[in-house]
A protein has these predicted regions:
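Active-site-adjacent betaalpha module
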Residues: 3, 10-128
């Protein structure tokens, strides 16, 4: 987050998000995931990757019609992104082994809902 006011209600609900302040170690891209000059990195402050970003405009400009979603948490950011992706008419795939949640029951329930309503849930082997 760039300031104490950004996403204040979201951060009040989930205080651990306060560890994600701009410039801190908790927001660095893992060095095992190399980022080149040609890559586009999007900064987000809310659950969905689409909310208050230009991700949809950029994806459409690139001719993208399908997304593979990975990340944390299944019940939060992953689900919100999958729902918004569907609303923007993307074919959405969530890789079950590449998402997680602090609550195993919430993880399973959200994968079930995503598969039933918003996209496809698969294993990494299914992507090939």
């Amino acid at each position: 987050y760039e300031s104490d006011d950004e996403a204040a209600v979201f951060r009040e609900k989930i205080p651990s998000l306060n560890a994600l302040m701009a410039g801190g170690d908790n927001v660095l891209i893992d060095s095992r995931l190399p980022v080149s000059a040609e890559d586009r990195v999007f900064r987000k402050a809310h659950a969905s990757c689409f909310f208050a970003t230009d991700l949809n405009v950029w994806l459409r400009g690139q001719g993208v019609d399908s997304l593979v979603v990975a990340g944390f948490t299944t019940s939060g950011c992953v689900r919100a992104t999958a729902v918004d992706a569907l609303q923007y008419d993307y074919r959405t795939i969530v890789v079950a082994d590449a998402v997680g949640d602090r609550d195993p029951a919430a993880h399973r329930a959200n994968l079930y809902d995503i598969e039933a309503k918003y996209g496809d849930v698969c294993s990494p082997a299914d992507l090939t």
